[in-house]
Amino acid sequence: MNGVIKKIISRLRDIRSEEEKILEFISSLRLSSTQALLDIGCGYGNKLKPIQALGINAVGVDANAVLIQRNREAGLSCMTSEEFKQTDDTYDVLLMSHIIEHFMPERLLEFMDSYLDRLKLGGHLIIATPLNSPYFYDDFDHIKPYHPVGIDMVFGGSELQVQYYARNCIQLQDLWFRREPLKLTFFAGLYVKKHSRLPKLINLLLALLFRLSFGVIGKTNGWIGLYKKVAK
């Protein structure tokens, strides 16, 4: 019963998936066959597969050498972080999907700058990341949620007084906020089977309201930003 409820809620919540929006942003750039996209932190290649299916010259990079080997065996173009450092290739598009929330500010600054150094002037960066929520830290290695305003303060060439200044400059071109159903969170019945299933049934109702209202009755829990690299 619990598994059935979870599946129904999962189907009801996806009015428009994040993956679809990422592909829409990439498609809007109308990349030619000579242009290249780098998927940073590509993991299992879940983003690489549909991107390459669009006919785009896409390469993945990840710190996990085991995953990179599996991706290669599956026919995906990938390299490890160490292999990437040995190259001097530049790219037209960078994709950072669910990456930045795993870094503290100082480390994120250097991480992003190291990749933005390899983004061509006029090229684009796509960031997909969650916002703060009661379940942000369900992911054990989530460190900090980041807002578009915060990214702009450090990477947008802002003259505001901040602790960090990036050596690269990016400007926000487009923005999409991900939404999901309202839901109960801190109830024992959501975690332990022996407790009442009422919270799960209430969450099912809230997911249905989210769907019927086309996402109006819900909350924002993440965002995708399309940025362009510009001269400082």
How would you label these PLM feature ranges?
Residues N46, A63, V93-M96, F103-K120, ...:
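S-adenosyl-L-methionine-dependent methyltransferase catalytic module, highlighting the catalytic core
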Residues M1-D89, V93-L95, R107-D113, G218-Y227, ...:
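Conserved N-terminal segment of class I S-adenosyl-L-methionine
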Residues S10-D14, I100, I143:
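Pocket-edge positions in alpha/beta enzyme catalytic cores
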